[in-house]
């Protein structure tokens, strides 16, 4: 089995995997905007592109961790791991701390999924972030304790899990190159499946309107 939850959120937990506060949601929670601006000035544009791959924004988990460090030091001090909603559920089911979202956690992880210890110090300790795994990797099984709490069968294999958008993409068949879908909700996303890594394209700063559709 696998779990999905809102992507690019940040949930600090203690050593018993108990949430220390409500999760900070993805980019619609803009509380870390000042941290994003500070980091942009701190690194400079060229270094930002190298480390983050895009302009830093409140959707980046690193900015949320920095916000917690600055504004909720008592929560920050008690944090054993900074997780996502999905990795929290996986940890509660299996006792294993793994995470898929290394992209949203840049620059805390390197491209190969290993911890970027050289950059971690500004945000957190290297041991406060979970090990990376692919979303379909089997990372453990449902523990007897989790089975008693959920009604699931003990020993059921559990995969890493993923964010909401990825799960929705798979649910509508976005698994072959050339397929695409739109996701509507609090945010709108367009997904297109390719057979190679495309990378990120930097958009101009500021507000604007983009016309879509066919006339």
Which ranges hold each PLM region?
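Glycine-rich phosphate-binding loop of actin/hexokinase-like ATP-binding domains
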Residues: 9-39, 78-79, 83-116, 156-215
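Short, small/polar residue-rich loop motifs at catalytic or cofactor-binding pockets
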Residues: 5-7
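Residue-level signal for inorganic ion chemistry
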Residues: 1, 29, 68
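Gly/Ser/Thr-rich active-site cleft segment
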Residues: 13, 49-163
């Amino acid at each position: 089995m696998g779990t999905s939850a809102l992507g690019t959120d940040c949930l600090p937990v203690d050593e018993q995997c108990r949430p220390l506060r409500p999760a900070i949601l993805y980019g619609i929670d803009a509380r870390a905007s000042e941290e994003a601006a500070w980091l942009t000035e701190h690194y400079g544009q060229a270094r930002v592109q190298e480390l983050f791959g895009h302009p830093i924004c409140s959707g980046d988990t690193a900015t949320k961790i920095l916000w917690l460090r600055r504004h909720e030091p008592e929560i920050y001090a008690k944090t054993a791991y900074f997780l996502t909603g999905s990795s929290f559920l996986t940890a509660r089911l299996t006792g294993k701390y793994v995470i898929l979202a290394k992209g949203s956690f840049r620059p805390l992880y390197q491209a190969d999924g290993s911890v970027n210890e050289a950059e971690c110090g500004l945000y957190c300790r290297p041991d406060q972030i979970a090990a990376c795994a692919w979303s379909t990797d089997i990372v453990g099984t449902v523990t007897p304790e989790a089975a008693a709490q959920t009604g699931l069968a003990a020993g059921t294999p559990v995969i890493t899990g993923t964010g909401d958008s990825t799960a929705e993409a798979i649910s509508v068949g976005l698994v072959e190159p050339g397929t695409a879908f739109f996701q509507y909700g609090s945010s709108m996303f367009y997904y297109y499946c390719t057979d190679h890594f495309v990378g990120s394209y930097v958009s101009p700063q500021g507000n604007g309107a983009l016309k879509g559709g066919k006339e």
